[in-house]
């Protein structure tokens, strides 16, 4: 994939590697080269964990994994867990949100015995915010949020809050308690503010980098040579930043883009504080 004049062929984090190719034959050759390089240093690729994920325009030909003794056809998948985050061929974030919800409940239930035995409210709140909230929002720096996804996160967090303070949904309704009332009782962080703060913090790091990393290049990339799909353009990661942070005049014309503001660390920290009150 060509991005701003450079070819993006792989992503690497420790021994977790993604190869990016425009044709299955190219992918097979790249895999063979990787196998060869790994064997030179005594490493082997796990064929059981190596899968093929394609977009809807990809050639359906099979990808093969070769070794000196045998050749294996790799399985195609519609989704894959990479670095703890589920990615899929449709760029749909909802399955990952469901995973985060399950992870948050697992974290809550796993720490329940500890929190139930603690009477100090401040410690209980700190445990919740440091164990359950990160499980619910893991990887949220890279989320492209819309109202439906935000509501899913908010509802899950509200359920966890009720469990923390010992109130069921029925009891909440009988006592005519609103979301704000439960928040006063729980004193935990607001999840959507927490997500926004993490995203803004990450956006600032990306904008200020000057070492040519792919995260920055992909954020700035405009694929002018690609045709747009028919229909409404999917929401992009930077759309919320343009809408909420970019400054405009009375006619809606851009005065200062968010990426320019983010290059000034002090000014960006002020932006984060203004946009994430009480997070």
Curated annotation (Swiss-Prot):
SUPFAM superfamilies: DNA/RNA polymerases (SSF56672). Residues 1-87 form the Reverse transcriptase domain. This is Putative uncharacterized transposon-derived protein F52C9.6.
């Amino acid at each position: 994939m060509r991005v701003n004049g450079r070819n993006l062929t792989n992503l690497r984090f420790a021994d977790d590697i993604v190869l990016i190719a425009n044709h299955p034959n190219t992918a097979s050759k790249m895999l063979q080269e990787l196998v060869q390089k790994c064997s030179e240093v005594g490493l082997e690729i796990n064929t059981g964990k190596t899968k093929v994920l394609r977009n809807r325009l990809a050639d359906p030909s099979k990808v093969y994994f070769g070794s000196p003794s045998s050749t294996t056809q790799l399985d195609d998948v519609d989704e894959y867990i990479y670095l703890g985050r589920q990615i899929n061929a449709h760029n749909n974030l909802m399955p990952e949100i469901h995973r985060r919800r399950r992870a948050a409940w697992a974290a809550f239930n796993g720490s329940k015995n500890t929190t139930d035995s603690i009477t100090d409210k401040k410690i209980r709140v700190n445990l919740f915010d440091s164990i359950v909230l990160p499980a619910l929002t893991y990887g949220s720096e890279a989320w492209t949020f819309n109202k439906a996804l935000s509501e899913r996160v908010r509802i899950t967090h509200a359920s966890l809050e009720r469990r923390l303070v010992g109130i069921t949904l029925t009891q909440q309704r009988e006592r005519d308690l609103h979301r704000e009332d439960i928040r006063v009782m729980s004193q935990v962080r607001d999840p959507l503010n927490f997500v926004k703060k993490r995203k803004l913090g990450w956006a600032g790091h990306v904008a200020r980098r000057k070492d040519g990393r792919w995260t920055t290049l992909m954020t700035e990339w405009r694929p002018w040579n690609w045709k747009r799909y028919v229909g409404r353009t999917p929401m992009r990661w930077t759309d919320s930043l343009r809408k909420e942070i970019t400054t405009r005049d009375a006619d809606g014309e851009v005065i200062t883009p968010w990426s320019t503001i983010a290059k000034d660390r002090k000014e960006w920290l002020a932006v984060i504080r203004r946009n994430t009150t009480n997070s």
